[in-house]
A protein has these predicted regions:
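Acidic, His/Gly-rich catalytic cores of divalent-metal-dependent hydrolytic chemistry
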Residues: 187-196, 200-311
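N-terminal active-site segment of His-dependent metallophosphoesterases
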Residues: 1-57
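Beta-strand-turn-beta hairpins that frame and shape the catalytic cleft
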Residues: 1-4, 104-113, 188-193, 222-223
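A contiguous binding-surface segment within folded domains or other stable secondary-structure elements
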Residues: 147-219
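Active-site neighborhood of divalent metal-dependent phosphoester bond hydrolases
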Residues: 47, 54-105, 109-114, 121, ...
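Active-site environment of divalent metal-dependent phosphoester hydrolases
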Residues: 10-15, 39-42, 64-69, 120-122, ...
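Active-site neighborhood of phospho(di)ester-bond hydrolases with catalytic His/Asp-centered motifs
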Residues: 6-7, 31-36, 40, 58-63, ...
Length: 311
């Protein structure tokens, strides 16, 4: 059986189209979806019906699905979520709301597990360790190669003092996750961990591409093939600049553009900057209101988008 593993589409229908065309060309028979299907790009009402109708599909929800249920406010910090919620078709929202947080099943002699973040399997410290807000600082010489990232990812996992203990009590099988938008996989004995990367919003400091992973399970053998379909984001950026989303959430959408043109994280760094800016001008309103959010972004832009490390 050949599985196409897809995560973090984030409303990017053109990227999903590239992935599905490639998966079909390479004989994908089943589709495993690891969450975060909307918010960031505006085509989620095309993305969701496409995913729902894939053959032999299994899907879980991500962390951003819950943002579609935020009470609408006047702030700019969550404006992109409010806009997406206001435009989400009811049947698409109902499908998202029906998705479980995790799935576990046996198929073709193998146990499968899907959750949105690695922390569901190995603890929250693993989620924190692999957050994308450290990658842009770790790889100032980006774009990096997949081989380098795979090696670094494995070493980082193995370097954790309790990794062997956690692995020892984890049932054998294949563990699929997304969340940090970084394509990787690692096998430790009969434990295989796969992050297909982000289909629609890659942040792994490699070449910008529509990412997914092919997994073949046959006669007890597991074969992983990471797939990246490069494309130019600039035409999509120009198209989105004419969209309702750009008018409703210009700061957030400009952050999306920065991420796409560098294949690295900017959103978290900007939120750190906005917090410092708001404190400096004596604005204690949270979430950030439009005037402060916009002014903070304009200053951050003038300063060359400085990267503010996490605590």
């Amino acid at each position: 059986m050949k599985y196409a593993i897809i995560a973090d589409v984030h409303g990017n229908m053109p990227a999903l189209k590239l992935v599905l065309e490639d998966a079909q060309k390479h004989g994908a028979e089943s589709y495993l979806l690891a969450g975060d299907y909307s918010i960031r790009a505006p085509w989620f009402n095309d993305v969701i019906p496409t995913l729902r109708t894939l053959p032999n599909v299994r899907a879980i929800c991500g962390n951003e699905e819950k943002y579609l249920h935020l009470p609408k406010g006047e702030d700019a910090q969550f404006a992109i979520c409010y806009w997406a919620a206001s435009r989400m078709q009811p049947n698409n929202l109902a499908w998202l709301d029906s998705l479980p947080e995790q799935m576990d099943w046996s198929e073709n002699g193998t146990d499968f597990h899907i959750a949105h973040a690695l922390g569901a399997f190995l603890g929250n410290e693993m989620t924190r360790l692999f957050r994308t807000s450290v990658l842009a600082l770790r790889y100032p010489d980006r774009p990096i190669t997949s081989e380098r990232f795979l090696s670094d990812n494995r070493k980082l996992m193995e370097s954790q003092p309790d990794f062997e203990e956690k692995l020892a009590v984890l049932p054998e099988g294949i563990y699929i996750y997304g969340h940090n938008h970084a394509q990787t996989h690692a096998r430790f004995g009969n434990h295989l961990f796969i992050n297909p990367g982000s289909c629609g919003h890659p942040l792994d400091c490699m070449q910008f591409a529509a990412c997914y992973t092919l997994l073949t399970v046959e006669n007890g053998e597991w074969l992983v093939e990471e797939r990246r379909i490069p494309y130019d984001p600039k035409p999509l950026i120009e198209q989105i600049k004419q969209s309702e989303q750009y008018k409703a959430a210009p700061v957030w959408t400009n952050l999306v553009f920065l991420d796409w043109t560098t294949c690295s994280e900017h959103m978290v760094y900007f939120l750190h900057y906005a917090e410092a800016y708001a404190n400096r001008i004596g604005d204690n309103r949270r979430p950030f209101m439009p005037d402060t959010f916009r002014a903070a972004f304009e200053e951050w832009e003038r300063e060359g988008y400085p990267l503010i490390p996490d605590e």
